[in-house]
Amino acid sequence: MKQDLMKGVIDMHVHTNPDLRLRAYDDFELMEAAIRVGARAIVIKTHQGTTMDRAYLCNRHNEIVHGKTNNFTMFGSITLNKVVGGINPKAVDVALRLGAKVVWLPTQSAKN
């Protein structure tokens, strides 16, 4: 695949390690791969709660290691499974105030 095909891409849904299931990449490996191909952003997701703290650390690492040499941003999210109390407005409020950009409805604890 030509590397420039990924330039500017935004992936809205990527699962990374650490996770209860083994994933292909951890947060930092995914960030570095995304920077290499010129991706614009990635939203990291877990079924076990939140990822905005992990996204913050990736963005901080990117800033320290790469400076202003790319425009990549990692975004975090919250998934409203039982781990965070299900449909929990307080958890959503805190997640958004801590930087989450996506709120996922229940997945593993959904009744459907």
Q: What do the PLM-derived regions correspond to, one by one?
A:
Residues 15-17, 47-49, 77-83, 106-110:
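Active-site beta-loop-alpha junctions enriched in small/polar residues
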Residues 69-71, 81-112:
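Extended substrate/RNA-proximal surfaces in nucleic-acid metabolism proteins
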